[in-house]
Regions:
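P-loop (Walker A) phosphate-binding loop of NTP-binding proteins
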Residues: 12
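Walker A/P-loop
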Residues: 18
Length: 199
């Protein structure tokens, strides 16, 4: 069994990344895992700036390059200090995938992708009220295009607790998670392969 210290959950807005991260944290107890994401730093911004970004999809007041550098810098520091981390993100561009791979290539995480039907994402987004439908749709259309994963899970009709219950044994019981290397290889070949397992 590998000594897993980093799990990356990738998926569009509304697919249940944060909910799964919290369920995994509880499922891994007594081993402690931290949950970290871009939102961790974005919610440090002034409320008016955050509201403009989330409610109006206007990111002009946010230095996204600086936020990205800081997110990965903080994440590397947490890992280097010995923490186990569940990191969730949305990858909407090839550049975003490259930044992730470059920043975290030495940590070889388990990669998990969450998917969901558009109808359910739309329902969740409206219920949450903290994202625009436009942003959710963009994530729905682009998620899965840029990163190979070890596990791909449809959350449309499954609770985060149910998913965590089935996913944790797979993570701790596997001797190898190679999606990270396949993702690095993909940068050269330009082809995205299928996940090794769909729990």
């Amino acid at each position: 069994m590998q000594d897993i210290r980093l799990i990356v959950i990738e998926g569009g807005s509304g697919t249940g990344k944060s909910s799964l991260a919290h369920s995994l944290q509880e499922r891994f107890q007594p081993q402690q895992w931290l949950h970290f994401s871009f939102d961790t730093l974005l919610y440090c911004l002034p409320p008016s700036v955050l509201d403009m970004a989330n409610q109006r999809n206007d990111w002009s007041a946010v230095d996204q390059n600086a936020i990205t550098r800081s997110v990965y810098g903080c994440l590397r520091t947490l890992l280097d200090d010995g923490h186990r981390v569940i990191f969730d993100c949305v990858l909407m561009t090839e550049r975003g995938a490259r930044e992730l791979l470059t920043a975290l290539q030495s940590y070889r995480p388990v990669l998990v992708r969450l998917t969901c039907s558009w109808h359910e994402i739309e329902r969740r987004t409206i219920a949450r009220g903290d994202r625009t439908i436009e942003e959710a749709r963009r994530g729905f259309e682009t998620s899965g295009l840029f990163l190979n994963v070890d596990y791909e899970i449809d959350t449309t009709h499954r609770s985060s607790a149910e998913i965590a219950e089935s996913l944790v044994p797979l993570i701790v019981g596997s001797s190898s998670h190679d999606a990270w290397q396949r993702s690095l290889d993909r940068l050269d070949t330009g082809s995205v392969q299928q996940p090794s397992y769909d729990p």
